[in-house]
A protein has these predicted regions:
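Active-site and adjacent substrate-binding regions of carbohydrate-active enzymes
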Residues: 1-437
Length: 437
């Protein structure tokens, strides 16, 4: 490769930090920005190039920061904007780069836009979100990822609002040009500060079919496939690239929920001018959790299926560039999922998985803690969990008088909280963050 054609993010290793669980600097039991600053030399010593932070914006924390109430402010538990500016300077001083999460499928219901929107149908912010007025009778069936229905009734406007996730995460209306311009302006704010890119959360979901055809969870169990790739999705991403992304030397990676082999190149093909990378959900689909699914080896996965998945994704990306991962904040720990976390095999399995990630074509993504072989915690009480998806699903099973013990056993393998426990800075067996739960 010619020196002047080298693209920095193609040669990078990305280190993902879930801030709440990483390093606590003030003893309140919550990881924070100053804690991350104190660990930058350690991070640099790992040989990584890019730090990706999960959401650090102001949030009421219904979904651990993925419900944003102010895109231009820092969550108080994490610190201040001055702390962030110092973090960014210290990152760059070590020749590292910093990318943030971009969460623009939805906001928090405490965001000023939604607070204004629910005052009146005549309020200019009303059209920033998706609504179904009572005059149109009951809204079409739309299951939520976190709740039974993706519609919640608002008495102030006498209309239901749409939320694919929690009812405290109303979905933005990307058909509204003002919404898109507001998002682009916010992105410029962070790029002008000097950040080096965005990981884009749930990006295939931002475009909605305004007719809202009914979705029956029994007929369409894969809601991501049902909700992704709405009208004008690629027009929006191309517009975002033209208006914002192309103006900066940055990297972008999209969360590729429901993106198939046939569709991935539409997002990352160089001629498309949309995103740089997209990570698919293949690793989450290869792993089996029932003996019926994997009768030969019990709870496990097929090595052949794993190979086919990665080979297929690499081929489908074409002239684009793959994002390579085996775990993140939404998945169980990769060692417990794809390796063997028993003490006698843990080190060997962790090194094997690391070798796999680092020898594939593409940019590898590494979740903080994987480098020391962190495993699933295997919680056995619902009170140990903080993930809204786990908690809401448990309530639904209780309501139906289902088997909650079976559910808890499955959550030991599948819950997002498996990847969100405190970073183990020593071998004491206690959380690094004093007072943390």
């Amino acid at each position: 490769m010619e020196q002047n054609n080298r693209i920095w993010w193609k040669e990078a290793v990305v280190y993902q930090i879930y801030p709440r669980s990483f390093k606590d600097s003030n003893g309140d039991g919550i990881g924070d920005l100053c804690g991350i600053i104190s660990c930058l030399d350690y991070i640099k010593s790992l040989g990584v190039d890019v730090i990706w932070l999960n959401p650090i914006y102001a949030s009421p924390n219904d979904d651990n920061g993925y419900d944003i109430s102010d895109y231009r402010a820092i969550m108080k538990e994490f610190g201040t904007m001055e702390d962030f500016d110092l973090l960014l300077r210290e990152v760059h001083a070590r020749n590292l780069k910093l990318i943030l999460d971009l969460v623009v499928n939805h906001t928090s219901d405490e965001h000023p836009w939604f607070q204004e929107a629910r005052k009146s149908r005549k309020n200019p912010y009303y059209t920033y979100y998706h609504w179904w007025p009572v005059e149109q009778e009951t809204p079409p069936l739309r299951p939520s990822y976190f709740e039974e229905s993706a519609w919640t009734y608002d008495p102030h406007t006498r209309a239901w609002y749409l939320h694919y996730f929690s009812r405290k995460q109303p979905d933005l209306n990307w058909e509204n040009r003002e919404v898109r311009e507001a998002v682009y302006d916010m992105m410029r704010f962070w790029f002008d500060k000097g950040i080096d890119g965005f990981r884009m959360d749930s990006i295939p979901l931002i475009a909605k079919d305004p007719a809202f055809p009914p979705i029956d969870r029994k007929k369409y169990p894969d809601l991501f496939s049902s909700y992704a790739h709405g009208p004008h999705l690629h027009e929006y991403l191309h517009e975002m690239n033209r208006e914002v992304l192309s103006k900066y030397d940055i990297m972008t990676v999209g969360e590729g929920s429901a993106v198939t082999y046939k569709e991935v190149e539409k997002f990352v093909g160089p001629e498309r001018q949309e995103l740089d990378m997209l990570y698919g959900f293949g690793p989450s689909e290869v792993r089996n959790y029932t003996t019926a699914d994997c009768p030969d080896s019990g709870i496990g996965y097929s090595l052949i299926a794993l190979k086919k998945m990665f080979s297929g994704w690499d081929k489908a990306v074409g002239k684009g560039w793959p994002a390579i991962y085996l775990g993140n904040h939404d998945q169980p720990r990769m060692l417990s999922r794809f390796g063997d976390d028993r003490p006698q095999f843990r080190v060997y399995a962790a090194k094997m998985l690391a070798t796999f990630l680092l020898t594939m074509r593409g940019t590898p993504y590494w979740l903080a803690g994987d480098e020391i072989g962190m495993c699933n915690p295997k919680f056995d009480r619902i009170g140990d969990y903080r993930d809204i998806a786990t908690l809401n699903q448990y309530k639904q099973i209780e309501k139906r008088k289902g088997d909650t013990q079976w559910f808890l056993q499955m959550q030991q393998q599948t819950s997002r909280d498996n990847a969100r426990t405190p970073f183990q800075w020593d071998n004491s067996g206690q959380p690094e963050c004093p007072g943390s739960e």
